[in-house]
Amino acid sequence: MMAAMATARVRMGPRCAQALWRMPWLPVFLSLAAAAAAAAAEQQVPLVLWSSDRDLWAPAADTHEGHITSDLQLSTYLDPALELGPRNVLLFLQDKLSIEDFTAYGGVFGNKQDSAFSNLENALDLAPSSLVLPAVDWYAVSTLTTYLQEKLGASPLHVDLATLRELKLNASLPALLLIRLPYTASSGLMAPREVLTGNDEVIGQVLSTLKSEDVPYTAALTAVRPSRVARDVAVVAGGLGRQLLQKQPVSPVIHPPVSYNDTAPRILFWAQNFSVAYKDQWEDLTPLTFGVQELNLTGSFWNDSFARLSLTYERLFGTTVTFKFILANRLYPVSARHWFTMERLEVHSNGSVAYFNASQVTGPSIYSFHCEYVSSLSKKGSLLVARTQPSPWQMMLQDFQIQAFNVMGEQFSYASDCASFFSPGIWMGLLTSLFMLFIFTYGLHMILSLKTMDRFDDHKGPTISLTQIV
């Protein structure tokens, strides 16, 4: 089944290949093509659907090689299964997955015993109806849970294997079960094959439980974001291959974001640098905040319309200081979408509270918010405005990112950036384009103004003599 997803290779003769590589523009063209292909691959994830009912999808509906399925097209595939199929829907949500994972680790070329997707392949073979979409737009997947909730009229229930065995599912009542696969492809302690095999075992155990209870169902497997099977290689215009004995660059250590959890991850917060000043005395809170297991999140709170992330630090400036990020989620009728806003940032210390307005930290609730600088300093944009001036407190967050609504796992959704449209780089590009357009127009005008001479003197011919008439 997965072998059909592998692409065929085209072989070139040695003479043709040597002739092509003599062309100076070919490496540059291949570099740009590879970069464009890599950028496009990061925007899509696969989606696998199967059901215990028959005739939910047409036999040729899954022939989508090279096509990216949009959210509208995905709804046309899901509507028949949700309206005519079973009312019990399972959504297996993995951290990272790409179509290349099936090619690299699936049971292709008859090697079924080496497949990391044995339970998934068996489920697809035995399912009366199945559908495989190799490339689905990330936006469609990010809104899949909300779409299923609206179509079924049931809230998503986060379950694990133990909880599923205790549930009593009814074929007539709708149920949306969200199963987060416990292994993530970002784990450095496990190989990708072991990660995918562990996820496949969870899928097999869940399906066995439903089969033993004789419960009809429709299942879907997808991921939050794509993964990369091959190791990233820097593509430059000068050449595509690695240099011999090249030393691999050491990647910087990136700490995981701060995550507030109740029954699931609710609020995510990250910054490359988190610094605070009190009476012009600066303290770097980055090593005390990110990657710290004992971070005090007492006072944090979350629901669908309001979120509060509370960070408490002891012995900061000689006392206990608490920073509270207050966010609200509202539905705006004009856009018919939910937007979140960080209403304020509170600093609690010694019984006093300092307030910073942060109304410019806003975006659609399905996205996270990212900004290069969120600071109270004027030279850094002043997105944080103190209510009382002058304030003894100063804040500076570099490469700031936060998400408090529609969080799925320990990873941020795609970010809504604070960068304005008319940035200095865009102004430079516009002015340069206008200047080049002026030069082109002037040159075209000069070319069109050229005139040919219909008469001229022939210096090699006889001279013209004029007789003087008296």
Curated annotation (Swiss-Prot):
GO terms for biological process: cellular response to increased oxygen levels; endosomal lumen acidification; endosome to plasma membrane protein transport; Golgi lumen acidification; intracellular iron ion homeostasis; intracellular pH reduction; lysosomal lumen acidification; osteoclast development. The keyword Protein biosynthesis does not apply. N-glycosylated. It is found in: Endoplasmic reticulum membrane; Endoplasmic reticulum-Golgi intermediate compartment membrane; Cytoplasmic vesicle, Secretory vesicle, Synaptic vesicle membrane; Cytoplasmic vesicle, Clathrin-coated vesicle membrane. Its main location: endoplasmic reticulum. Keywords: Congenital disorder of glycosylation, Cytoplasmic vesicle, Disease variant, Disulfide bond, Endoplasmic reticulum, Glycoprotein, Hydrogen ion transport, Ion transport, Membrane, Phosphoprotein, Signal, Synapse, Transmembrane, Transmembrane helix, Transport. Residues 42-231 form a propeptide. One of its GO terms (cellular component) is clathrin-coated vesicle membrane. Belongs to the vacuolar ATPase subunit S1 family. Residues 441-470 are cytoplasmic. This is V-type proton ATPase subunit S1. It comes from Homo sapiens (Human). GO terms for molecular function: ATPase activator activity; small GTPase binding; transporter activator activity. widely expressed, with highest levels in brain and lowest in liver and duodenum. PANTHER family: V-TYPE PROTON ATPASE SUBUNIT S1 (PTHR12471:SF2), VACUOLAR ATP SYNTHASE SUBUNIT S1 (PTHR12471).
